[in-house]
Amino acid sequence: MKKLIVLLGLAVALSSCEVKSNLYNWGNKSNSKNATEYESSVYNYYHSQSPESLCALLCEYEYMVTHPGGERGVVPPGICAEYGYLLLSPDTPQIFSEHATKRQKERFNSGDYSATFREKGISMLQKEIELYPESAVFIQPLIKKFSQQ
């Protein structure tokens, strides 16, 4: 009887550990180790700070914003804010125009990256507030700062 109770308790404990839900889409699966393109792009950008890694990260953010998935069907928290901030960084348009691949440039479909990135950056910050109103305290000052420039 004791063995049955122990086995039953163990079965309940182990069955409650599995989590199957994905509230958000964190990018495409890129390899057999279950890393995503997003994870790889963020890692590469923050470790190398190269122009190519910035272009790859911008394209991954663009994909995540245009293809939200998961159970909620919305962009994960912070993605729009970080994407918008990167788009509004002063060097981003020039870096993108000089270092992005043809395929990456086609995603943005524009020759004037300065105007496009500025408009899109501000709209991404606004979208972050729309999706996650609690972020307004942090995002509103950024919108104000970049709108005045």
Regions found by a protein language model. Give the residues of each.
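The tetratricopeptide repeat
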Residues: 79, 138-139
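Short, Lys/Arg-rich amphipathic alpha-helical interaction segments
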Residues: 139-149
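TPR/TPR-like (Sel1-like) alpha-helical repeat modules
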Residues: 112-135
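"Short basic amphipathic alpha-helical interaction patches in structured regions
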Residues: 99, 123-126, 141-143
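Sec-dependent bacterial lipoprotein signal peptides
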Residues: 1-19
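N-terminal alpha-helical interaction modules that lie
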Residues: 17-83, 87-108, 114-116, 131, ...
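Short glycine/proline-enriched turn or capping motifs at secondary-structure junctions
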Residues: 2-3, 133-137
